Amino acid sequence: MNTAAASTSTPSRDALARFVLEGAAVRGAVVSLDATLRDILGGHPYPPALVRALAEFAAAAALLASTLKFKGSLVVQLASEGPVRLAVVECDASLGLRATAQWRDEAGALPADATLAVLVGDL
């Protein structure tokens, strides 16, 4: 089993922007976590498929935390018996992010575009 962990606060190069489509009942938000993801992922031997999953979890956590008014932390977590045993991303009310992951050796052989079902061994 392999394990890696990292934490960071929201750096200045990251961005979160809300938008409204005029004339339509559509509003949303977009997030860019370039610097934060570099800090979280850098220096850790995450398999490519796990890098993608952690990036998606971090974006989801940041978007959800930005729309909720709360004190505390929001956690996005995956736990499985598959190639990825555990992937956790935590986002606090100030949008600080941290992440950790544990994976089995076979996760390194997965393609970078492996689906979530493949990561959890649900095929």
Regions found by a protein language model. Give the residues of each.
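N-terminal functional module of multi-domain proteins
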Residues: 2-3, 11-122
